[in-house]
Amino acid sequence: MLNKVIKTTRLTAEDINGAWTIMPTPSTPDASDWRSTNTVDLDETARIVEELIAAGVNGILSMGTFGECATLTWEEKRDYVSTVVETIRGRVPYFCGTTALNTREVIRQTRELIDIGANGTMLGVPMWVKMDLPTAVQFYRDVAGAVPEAAIAIYANPEAFKFDFPRPFWAEMSKIPQVVTAKYLGIGMLDLDLKLAPNIRFLPHEDDYYAAARINPERITAFWSSGAMCGPATAIMLRDEVERAKSTGDWIKAKAISDDMRAADSTLFPRGDFSEFSKYNIGLEKARMDAAGWLKAGPCRPPYNLVPEDYLVGAQKSGKAWAALHAKYSK
């Protein structure tokens, strides 16, 4: 394992462009057993990273919700990040994930994983006690001050973190130099948030990227993709077609790809309910990936390893639809 790599200049918003894929943390066959240790499939981790880079992704995010940040041991996190960093070898930027239940633990993990070689961290707020706005803002200020060399991607998931990420929050985040990007859900308030946070590169979900780029082509230059874990060709094609459309004004193909993505996702969310999906996010996403067959996500780590069977059927159907898109857009 790498203990340390040579640091580069801290990333800025201008460095965040294109297709940013969010990885799972591949698991060993016994990972659902609480007695198991060392449950990360490091060989599969390295293979996925290499394949993503070969496909042309612009950046990698990890250890979010379906990356199982909540259920990995510290030793597993360290080994996983070391493997990702060793495999990337500086070819694309990489944000690990260090969300935890308190500021001190977040800072400890962030320092160590940045020292290993991650460029930044995708970071949500501690969620045991629901945060108000001043507390959330101070949390990010403290982490940025403690680890000034780390770029921060705000992990803006209201369901996961019991925080709404309101408009004043973004205005305050834009004042923190280390906050360079945000994993962003929905685009209903995007135009206003872009005005409030001029120094942040917002990453809409891949399904929203076409529409978001139409709202503000200059500011919306990147997106996050989980569907790429079912095969990255669709995300890469979307990136390229949106970029082309910005130059030509012809958005027809970009919209068609976006429509394909939305159709493939239609069975992933139980009853179309994001809140219900969020209860089983990890299991549904990993089932989707395994059904697609591009990678081996493996079983979920406890306690989030129980998922209603009919929900899994929808996720698997989505994975197969994404696999078909990957084949279509690989041609």
UniProtKB/Swiss-Prot annotation:
Record GO biological process: naphthalene catabolic process
SUPFAM superfamilies xref list: Aldolase (SSF51569)
Molecular functions (GO terms): 4-hydroxy-tetrahydrodipicolinate synthase activity; aldehyde-lyase activity; trans-o-hydroxybenzylidenepyruvate hydratase-aldolase activity
Annotated InterPro entries: Aldolase_TIM (IPR013785), DapA-like (IPR002220), HBPHA/CBPHA (IPR048038)
Catalytic activity annotation: (3E)-4-(2-hydroxyphenyl)-2-oxobut-3-enoate + H2O = salicylaldehyde + pyruvate
Enzyme Commission numbers on file: 4.1.2.45
Pfam families named among the record's database cross-references: DHDPS (PF00701)
Pathway as given in its UniProt record: Aromatic compound metabolism; naphthalene degradation
Broad enzyme group: lyase
Keyword Lyase set for record: yes
Cysteine pairs bridged by disulfides in the record: none
Transmembrane regions listed in the UniProt entry: none
Keyword entries, A-Z: Aromatic hydrocarbons catabolism, Lyase, Plasmid, Pyruvate
Function summary: Involved in the naphthalene upper catabolic pathway. Catalyzes the transformation of trans-O-hydroxybenzylidenepyruvate (THBPA) to salicylaldehyde and pyruvate. The reaction is reversible. Can also use substrate which carry trans-alpha,beta-unsaturated keto acid side chain and adjacent hydroxyl group such as trans-4-(3-hydroxy-2-thianaphthenyl)-2-oxo-but-3-enoate, trans-4-(3-hydroxy-2-benzofuranyl)-2-oxobut-3-enoate, and trans-4-(3-hydroxy-2-thienyl)-2-oxobut-3-enoate.
Recorded family membership: Belongs to the DapA family.
Protein name: Trans-O-hydroxybenzylidenepyruvate hydratase-aldolase
Organism: Pseudomonas putida
Originating gene: nahE
